[in-house]
């Protein structure tokens, strides 16, 4: 099957049929090449943690993978690494990107959320993606990395070009990569000359028994933190608001008991996460997944979105239930590649929703068709019209 057939418009119907028919499917992947798709919870969870499934494209059989690639200076990131390189880089990053740093961001996140809501005024209508879900995380991530205010709109444009490229402008994605590479080259040079109180300056300075991050590793980490941190948060915030406004009973329950919010964020992530597919993997040897043997070097796609709707793991999975224990969802990964930015994504979503619901007691969906982005990498709305 062609993976794009129906998946962008009705992903959970497609995934349900696939889960019910077989554990692993032979498909045509997003890049147009043959691949394998894994959709059942136990199989997806096992695959995410299986060291035989490599993230390194060098393990792909020659000519079989033609997907998204970055220049070498941006490609040396955690999403393309296996141990021991992954272990080393993650350890160094962990010395700078600490729980204490994330905790210290909570107050600035709330101030940013309040300022964005102030700009909306007390009553009216708005596109909540453009006015809130997008500018909040780009502000947070740019503050985290020490990127000046005047460059933040550029990064929104660049990341949008990469995640949901315009078919009429295929050169835009390549141009965005070049622009980001040039920008981070200058930014790293400036941070070395004048370190600031920001994560990028700390990553430049971090040491571990004499080890340090290389220039390409710093460049690719800055790209990954900005790109993944921004995009995932935009989709998760927007999708969470849509889920709430589409389920008045759950919205009412959350308004009655705001203490539900931390657990609700986990349920939002399970119910409508920010991506339909995890990053591709390549077996370093023949691997059996769900009883199906996948030859070494072939492309494997796993779907946390499909796994999160597996009734074998989550009863009545197509129902949004803020009282559900959604722990164990796979939206943020599993195993050694579990999302390094998960605590920040949770904090941003929780704070964004708390501020929004406190400010607008009459928040509701506005008129107009809801359109999803045409991307398997970013499951999010083009716009979210609301009234308040």
Predicted regions and their residues:
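Cytochrome P450
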Residues: 1-388
């Amino acid at each position: 099957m062609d993976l794009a057939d129906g998946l962008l418009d009705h992903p959970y119907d497609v995934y349900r049929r696939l889960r019910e028919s077989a554990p692993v499917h032979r498909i045509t992947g997003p890049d147009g090449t043959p691949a394998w798709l894994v959709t059942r919870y136990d199989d997806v969870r096992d695959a995410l943690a299986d060291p035989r499934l490599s993230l390194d494209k060098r393990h792909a059989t020659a000519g079989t993978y033609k997907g998204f690639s970055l220049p070498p200076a941006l490609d040396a990131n955690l999403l393309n690494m296996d141990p021991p390189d992954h272990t080393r880089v993650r350890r160094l990053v962990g010395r700078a990107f600490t729980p204490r740093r994330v905790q210290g961001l909570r107050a600035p996140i709330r101030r940013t959320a309040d300022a964005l809501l102030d700009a909306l005024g007390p009553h009216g209508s708005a596109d909540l993606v453009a006015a809130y879900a997008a500018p909040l995380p780009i502000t947070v991530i740019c503050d985290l990395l020490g990127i000046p205010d005047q460059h933040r709109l550029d990064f929104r444009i660049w990341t949008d070009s990469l995640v949901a490229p315009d078919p009429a402008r295929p050169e835009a994605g390549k141009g965005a990569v070049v622009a980001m590479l040039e920008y981070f080259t200058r930014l790293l040079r400036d941070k070395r000359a004048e370190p600031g109180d920001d994560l990028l300056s700390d990553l430049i300075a971090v040491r571990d028994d004499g080890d340090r991050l290389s220039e390409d590793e710093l460049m690719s980490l800055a790209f990954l933190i900005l790109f993944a941190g921004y995009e995932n948060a935009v989709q998760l915030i927007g999708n969470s608001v849509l889920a709430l406004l589409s389920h008045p009973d759950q919205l009412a329950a959350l308004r009655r008991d705001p203490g539900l919010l931390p657990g609700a964020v986990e349920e939002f992530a399970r119910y409508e996460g920010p991506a339909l597919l995890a990053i591709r993997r390549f077996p370093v040897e023949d691997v059996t997944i769900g009883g199906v043997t996948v030859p070494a070097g072939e492309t494997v796609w796993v779907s946390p979105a499909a796994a999160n709707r597996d009734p074998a793991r989550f009863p009545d999975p197509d129902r949004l239930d803020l009282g559900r224990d959604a722990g164990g969802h796979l939206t943020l990964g599993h195993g050694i590649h579990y999302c390094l930015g998960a605590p920040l994504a949770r904090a941003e979503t929780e704070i964004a929703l708390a501020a929004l619901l406190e400010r607008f007691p009459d928040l509701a969906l506005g008129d107009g068709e809801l359109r999803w982005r045409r991307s398997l990498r970013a499951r999010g709305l083009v716009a979210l019209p609301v009234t308040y």
